[in-house]
Amino acid sequence: TYHQSFSGWSCVTRGLNGAGKSTVVAAFAEMLIDGHKTVPSSLLYRQIFLLDASSLISAAAGRGELEALVTEILNESFLSKNVILCLDNAQLFFEEGVGSVDLSNLLLPILEAGRLRIILTMDSQRYLQISQRNAQLATVLNTIVIEPSSPEETVRIMRDQLLGLE
């Protein structure tokens, strides 16, 4: 189950841990590649590249190297013209602390300009904390709230996923 509000090209899917944010993005990616009839023509056949924020942070030796890595990824995504970039666990890019870094100054101008489509996945509580500290972030992102599925929905989702694997 999800709720949405729209304002621009990029969005944040937020929900509890394990609610299915990444699964929703994966299902959307399949719809894009398959040319599903409900997908707007401007999005057809685009590719979604899923990058885990914690993996990117651990791959960089320090903040400067992380900024360079993220800048390179953003530039490559923009130049390819058919990429939607998904930053999984993106809350790690918007806060300071152990295992995280604040890349607001790097990401906000790109989100505001709207030249690159970006999907962020975040834990709901952390998103609310970040958006209170950084109201600009909340205004430039469409919000899609992913609610935990019921036991019946979970069984249906698992059945559908297993059929796809056969």
PLM features: residue spans?
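Short glycine-rich substrate-engagement loop in P-loop NTPases that contacts/grips substrate
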Residues: 47-77
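Conserved AAA+ ATPase "sensor/coupling" helix adjacent to the nucleotide-binding pocket
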Residues: 156-166
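Loop/turn-to-beta-strand initiation segments
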Residues: 9, 46-48, 78-85, 113-120, ...
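Post-Walker A helix-loop "phosphate-sensing" segment adjacent to the P-loop in P-loop NTPases
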Residues: 30-45, 56-58
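Conserved AAA+ ATPase "SRH/arginine-finger" region at the nucleotide-binding site
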Residues: 114, 142-155
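A short helix-turn-beta junction within AAA+ P-loop NTPase domains corresponding to the substrate/partner-engaging
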Residues: 108-109, 131-147
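Conserved ATPase-coupling elements of RecA-like P-loop NTPase cores
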Residues: 60-66, 80, 92-104, 129-132
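Walker A/P-loop nucleotide-binding motif
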Residues: 7-27
